[in-house]
Amino acid sequence: KQHQAAPAWVDMVTAFAVSDWDDPAWESKTLAWLDSCFDAGAVGVKVWKNIGMVSRDTAGNLIQIDDPKFDPIFSHIQKRDKVLMGHLAEPKNCWLPLEEMTTNNDRRYYGRHPEYHMYLQPDMPSHEELIGRRDRVLEKNPDLKFVGAHMGSLEYDVDELAKRLDRFPNMAVDLAARMGQVFYQTAENRDKVRNFFIQYQDRILYGTDLADNGERTREQLNQAMEDNWKRDWEFFVTSNTMESSLIDTPFQGLDLPKEVVDKVFYQNAVKWFGLID
């Protein structure tokens, strides 16, 4: 609806269901659905954390992203020159006890939602297993453009993320809902984080994860968007000493070169999603 209301301002990615995973016609129905979405203007496809963590087949097994049944789907997305976005796994904090988590927002969220706190669900896959399965998909599909949502669920260490970006040239990541982890690492080692953004300036997309879920008034939502944008803009373009409710420690802005900031905030989205500039 947003795309229809403002096509010049809003682009969309689509998704597909796995609720009918064991239907013999699942593949053909999914391919037809994706083509209809592409014809309607979708610039990519997003897969969600339900794959690997929630959705199960009729035998009760978790559906995993590296299942061969997905191969023709990912191949088709690549042939149509579209992007696959992946919110796969969760932040590594999800597998840690609350007192060991690195950001206050994760601590609050998993404290309120123990059902999603994997530390309390030892029978569920580990963070390492889910990331390994994602990596196998990228190994099998080297020409597929992939944007890892939420820093590719490697938000806890830019060195680990850099290893994946080196290994998979068609992989990029967005920063949505993971600025707390960026702030935390900046407080620990600003130079390392700053160098990461400069070295991988063509592979990082700004995002917020903010949405209108009906819980806030329009004024509250607008204020939240403005506050987040101003905070993050200050972090990227100045060397100010800053504080954030996301972490307990002060940190210093990265003061990135203008050309890097322009890519992170705008140009990379145009390039990776094939948007009209």
Task: Give the ranges of each region predicted by the language model.
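Active-site gating/metal-coordination segments in enzymes
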Residues: 2-118, 179
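H/E-rich (His + Asp/Glu) clusters that bind or coordinate divalent metals
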Residues: 118, 122, 127-136, 141-277
